[in-house]
């Protein structure tokens, strides 16, 4: 059987040519996918992959961190799984072409193909595995960031904070609203919290229930809750559904809500004379 040293030597001897061939292939594939990346990026990816191959031939477990880094980089620059799979398949074609150019005896050529594939296949499998892990982590972080943006608590005056809500409110988002409210009240030492629902399209029984719960939770940590943005259609819906908001201070606009919040903290907005 052909030794690892023979495989290493074959890849090393053809490294520069393989690097150029695969870099050119990546550029061609990127044009089909409309990726806007520099030539240096593709050259770096090609070099990293060939280095991983060479390192793995010496020690099968030595390139684990490099494989993870390559997969993470592919995710970060936006390369799709399809692009990655096609690119790796093209690399094997280029490698096979180089073996044919050597015009090795059939037996020797077969052994070389088998031996290279022994390293090539597990590496590719691990790259796809690490790509999936990196992608899931990235999506998870993006989801957390979006969740934070979906219920931000903003300090507007000393001891007064506003939570502007836009879009529908489901159970999961309601939990985030509650969590951010309670943490924010403590963090900003809020005395009054305004929940602005101007951008909430529908206020049904469930949404109202979540708002009442949030208001009660804010009261329990020593602050007062004020609901702003009660549009006429929402007011009508609340009345028709028999929703009791008597324990919550309500205002039809955020401006009036802020004026009330200032009054509740012994302040007011005044006009300066000329």
Curated annotation (Swiss-Prot):
Observed phenotype of the null mutant: Cells lacking this gene have a decreased response to salt stress, indicating that RsbRA is a positive regulator of sigma-B activity. Its activity is dependent on RsbRB.
Superkingdom of this protein's organism: Bacteria
Listed InterPro entries: Bact_StressResp_Reg, Globin/Proto, RsbRA_N, STAS_dom, STAS_dom_sf
Alphabetized GO MF terms: heme binding; oxygen binding
Chain ranges of the STAS domain: 150-265
Pfam families in the cross-refs: Rsbr_N, STAS
Modified residues (Phosphothreonine): 171, 205
Gene3D superfamilies: Globins (1.10.490.10), STAS domain (3.30.750.24)
Keyword Membrane: no
PROSITE patterns referenced in this protein's UniProt entry, alphabetically: STAS
SUPFAM superfamilies named in the record: SpoIIaa-like
Post-translational modification: Phosphorylated by RsbT. This threonine phosphorylation abrogates the ability of RsbRA to stimulate RsbT in vitro.
Keyword field: Phosphoprotein
Subunit structure of this chain's protein: Interacts with RsbRB and RsbS in the stressosome. The stressosome probably also contains RsbRC and RsbRD.
Protein name: RsbT co-antagonist protein RsbRA
